[in-house]
Amino acid sequence: MGGISIWQLLIIALIVVLLFGTKKLRSLGGDLGGAVKGFKNAMSSEDEKKAIEDTSAEKTAQTEEKKTESKDKEQA
């Protein structure tokens, strides 16, 4: 009673197609798909950058550890 039925959705879809035309709707869909794809690529590249920064920080910490160990051995 309070919800939208399938027939009402079909009528709304038909009106939208009549107003904008299939070419316009197709181009809008393509633009939306391209935007989603760009967003996903940006998110994955951000994750890769973060992973690279994490590994480089770990390598730096390991190098510093080795330096301090070798200095301690030399002093002993």
From Swiss-Prot:
GO terms for molecular function: protein transmembrane transporter activity. It comes from the Bacteria. GO terms for cellular component: TAT protein transport complex. GO terms for biological process: protein transport by the Tat complex. It is found in: Cell inner membrane. Residues 46-76 have a biased composition (Basic and acidic residues). It is a single-pass membrane protein. Keywords: Cell inner membrane, Cell membrane, Membrane, Protein transport, Translocation, Transmembrane, Transmembrane helix, Transport. Residues 43-76 are annotated as: Disordered. The chain crosses the membrane at residues 1-21. Belongs to the TatA/E family. Part of the twin-arginine translocation (Tat) system that transports large folded proteins containing a characteristic twin-arginine motif in their signal peptide across membranes. TatA could form the protein-conducting channel of the Tat system. The Tat system comprises two distinct complexes: a TatABC complex, containing multiple copies of TatA, TatB and TatC subunits, and a separate TatA complex, containing only TatA subunits. Substrates initially bind to the TatABC complex, which probably triggers association of the separate TatA complex to form the active translocon. This is Sec-independent protein translocase protein TatA. It comes from Shewanella loihica (strain ATCC BAA-1088 / PV-4).
